[in-house]
């Protein structure tokens, strides 16, 4: 009631009995396949990234979605944020000229302890965070020729596989593109 949520379900089974709703599936990647199997045929849903723990997981999830005629998307919302929409418009209108440099530098303190399941994952930073930046960059510059990435631990979160990444995207054009991400 505090947040004006009209209906709360006690289980996913109860929620999946609903008709004419959009399901927002936000579960750890290691259980996503099992949850997708339970989504009713013909439903509409948004899956929070990542789409499983591996390419094999993603392919199986895609297969289940197709077989059950589910309309689905994966949430990569950064490119739809107001600031990125405005930037995209400026780029499209040639207001900032030719893009020759694209660099993202981010240093934040993420409350990783709020998601203890992250400690079980082989990769954390790129599939759960930097993927938003990579998706946005691809929407602006297209697909890179190659990607070089190194993700490492951070001493403040020793139980996570990684929390920092250095990423270089190589393009055919005269574009230098790199990301330095520190959580």
Language-model segment annotations:
Residues 78-158:
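Predominantly a Rossmann-like dinucleotide-binding segment in NAD(P)-dependent oxidoreductases
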Residues 3, 7-64:
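Beta-loop-alpha module in the N-terminal Rossmann-like domain of NAD(P)-dependent dehydrogenases
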Residues 21, 43, 70-71, 98, ...:
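Short, well-ordered coil/turn segments that N-cap beta-strands
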Residues 167-169:
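Short beta-strand scaffold segments in enzyme catalytic cores
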Residues 47-48, 72-74, 179:
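Hydrophobic residues in well-ordered beta-strands that form the structural core
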Residues 157-162, 172-183:
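NAD(P)-dinucleotide binding in Rossmann-like oxidoreductases
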Residues 60-78, 97-104:
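Rossmann-fold dehydrogenase core element
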Residues 28-31, 51-52, 78-80, 152-153, ...:
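Short beta->alpha connector loops
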């Amino acid at each position: 009631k505090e947040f004006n949520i009209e209906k709360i379900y006690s289980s996913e089974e109860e929620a999946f009995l609903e008709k004419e709703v959009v399901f927002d599936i936000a579960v750890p990647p290691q259980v996503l396949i099992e949850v997708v199997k339970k989504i009713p045929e013909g439903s509409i849903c948004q899956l929070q990234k990542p789409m499983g723990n591996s390419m094999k997981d993603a392919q199986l999830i895609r297969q289940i979605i197709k077989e059950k005629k589910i309309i689905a998307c994966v949430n990569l919302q950064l490119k739809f944020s107001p600031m990125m929409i405005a930037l995209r418009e400026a780029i499209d209108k040639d207001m900032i000229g030719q893009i020759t440099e694209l660099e993202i530098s981010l240093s934040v303190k993420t409350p990783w302890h709020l998601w203890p399941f992250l400690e079980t994952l082989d990769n954390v930073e790129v599939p759960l965070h930097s993927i938003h930046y990579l998706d946005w960059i691809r929407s602006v510059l297209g697909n890179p020729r190659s990607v070089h990435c190194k993700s490492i631990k951070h001493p403040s979160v020793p139980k996570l596989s990684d929390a920092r990444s250095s990423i270089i995207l190589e393009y055919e054009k005269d574009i230098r593109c790199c990301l330095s991400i520190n959580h």
